[in-house]
Amino acid sequence: TAGGKEKGNPYHVYLYKVNFNGNNLICLTPEMGSHSINPSSNWDYFVTTYSTTKTAPKSILKDRDGKNLFQLSSSNTDNLKSNGWQEPLEFNVKARDDKTDLFGLMYIPSFYDKNDKYPVLNYIYPGPQSGSVGNYSFMVARRDFQALAELGFIVVAVDAMGTPGRSKSFHDAYYGNMGDNGLPDNIKAIEQLSKKYSGMDLSRVGIWGHSGGGFASTAALLRYPDFYDVAVSSSGNHDNRNYEADWGEKWHGLLEPLGIDSKDNSSEYDVKKTNYDIQANQLFVENLKGKLLIAHGMLDDNVPPSNTMLVVDELIKANKDFDLILFPNKRHGYGDMSNYMMRRKWDYFVKHLKGLEPPKGFSFN
């Protein structure tokens, strides 16, 4: 299977056959969409199930040459739409270099009016092992994107440079600078979309993410304080010197001391003078202007809570106001407290981007 060869969305995956010498590449699943393949044990036959973000899945039995033998199943979105389902808007914009194509999804309120103005929410997961969308097959819902849209926001998720599924150069776009997080592409995408959708209010922009997205959303508020106004950041690996070595070394490179004043050959160095400084959120807290809600599980055995404490410590030292949620006895995900975190996120955006007071005592339980 491979993507990027057929016309349209490069994230759509198709099945091919090819000779051992690399010649005579033939697509066996030309139907537009992302294909999931289930072969027979001898590969004489296979079933492909394919869909797009807007079209529901279909399953077809094919022979090894790609000939359609039988349509096994077909579905549509009629019942979903009759119950108020909103399909996501798939978009294609240019990256920071004004040349590279970027793809993503946008969610707008069911009551969208181009003459009204809506705050923008940017969901981010920078990877680099995956992107904010990644999978462009059909899903009834993606996280709480449409729910947030129904609160009066426009939600944008973009697969920025630095994420997989494209070329190696695309994936390596900011190797050695994990603090980049694809944020220049996210900003560029939102700015371009606002020219097409006049309802997008770029004077009110929020961002959120979890884990790597927590790292990226905090970085957004600290590095681009004139663009992003509010961030909700959970379980972020805010300084990859304090995360798994195989992660930082894979995407940022080996830790190297910089600016050592000592004239001897000592191994001592200043931890604030290394090639990892450019990705460490706690070193940028002086730039905080907007509203920041930061959260972490106290038993997180993926991203140690010390990552968030580094940022908290520097925020306090810099006399900055922020909001903090700590989840006792919770790991990287918050389990039965996840709905609480989602409610707090919704409330935070409603209060600080829409200027409204959230309903008291609301619970998803």
Locate the predicted segments by residue:
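Short beta-strand element of the alpha/beta-hydrolase
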Residues: 108, 116-127
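Short, conserved, GDST-rich strand-edge loop motifs in beta-rich repeat architectures
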Residues: 1-10, 130, 134
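Non-catalytic accessory segments flanking enzyme active sites
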Residues: 12-13, 25-116, 140, 146-150, ...
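Serine-hydrolase catalytic-loop signature spanning alpha/beta hydrolases and amidase-signature enzymes
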Residues: 128-130, 155
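Alpha/beta-hydrolase fold active-site loops
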Residues: 102, 119, 204
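Beta-propeller blade termini and top-face loops
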Residues: 11-14, 133-136, 236
